[in-house]
């Protein structure tokens, strides 16, 4: 293992350099992965799918994407983050291009699986690299700023995809956004090497290792923290997956408007992620996570009660806060609890649990909707979230992190 020394920088000193590049990289990585949910009504009608089959469309990507996080984390700890991040960007672009070229349901499912497998290197590799560039007291802010890129993709991609789909259909949306993603991945690899202005920085980008104790400590807090964070995120994402179908079938909204409406949720990430990082630096990672997780269940239940309009838009915005505020807190908590030589591997487990959990739960929620309707499904989902949060809070309440 290489041991390299890199000077920790202030948060603001990073803004003209590496950090904005990582924000753009995060944006590019999710530009295509953000498409299946808003385009689901169009895909459903094209292949005449029911709710369960629609859930399987989303699971094809999320399950493979989740599993690939494990391999991506393991490889990052051994060959370094630069290659894995680049593969994560170009891989989803290639997979998305093939999805856009698919002509049958089976072909689309196969290429969605491929897209997930090729994209698993980005998330386990990027947070440790970003976190090593700042002092620990600013770690949450840096990670929150980095998350703006992903949030921007999930906010803009539905709007762009809906506009493209009006002319070229859902396949045109995948193809149009996949091509620039691949191009950026290649450019990113070159720029990341050029922006390393010292030999130490270059080694840091290539190897990703530094001097830290080689242990995983405070396991009794780390495990329930990861369980709570990933379970809440997985349930929330699985529920979000059916919101476009919910507004089409429940409120009679057009498919194109439903595709664009999902952007309201992800708009929250543009400011909720930095806010979550800032709050976690000031108040602690655990208090931020517990507060937001206690909100998740009631907010999902309120989808049953709020009529379409400004109130419904407010609920979507709060769901976005529930989704995005805990993310920088969770990443910062894991980075702070785990030695650097194992960080990407543990982050791989974290993202596997969250994304893979979404892949498992999405068809389950689709099945419940098919058999019991939206009202009972949202009610049950909210109750389960509250219960899990209560149980995990028992183990986390006294944590000072």
Roles of regions detected by a PLM:
Residues 43-44, 75-76, 160-168, 247-248, ...:
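Interfacial helix-cap and linker-helix signal at transmembrane-aqueous boundaries
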Residues 67-103:
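Conserved MFS/SLC helix-loop-helix module at the cytosolic interface between two early adjacent transmembrane helices
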Residues 285-330:
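C-terminal transmembrane helical hairpin of 12-TM major facilitator-type secondary transporters
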Residues 146-193:
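Helix-loop-helix hairpin linking two adjacent transmembrane segments in secondary transporters
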Residues 36-37, 221-270:
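Extracytoplasmic gate region of multi-pass secondary transporters
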Residues 190-214:
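Flexible cytoplasmic inter-helical loops of multi-pass small-molecule transporters
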Residues 48, 80, 101-106, 284, ...:
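Helix-breaking motifs and short loop linkers at transmembrane-helix boundaries and internal kinks
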Residues 111-149:
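Cytoplasmic helix-loop-helix junction between adjacent transmembrane helices
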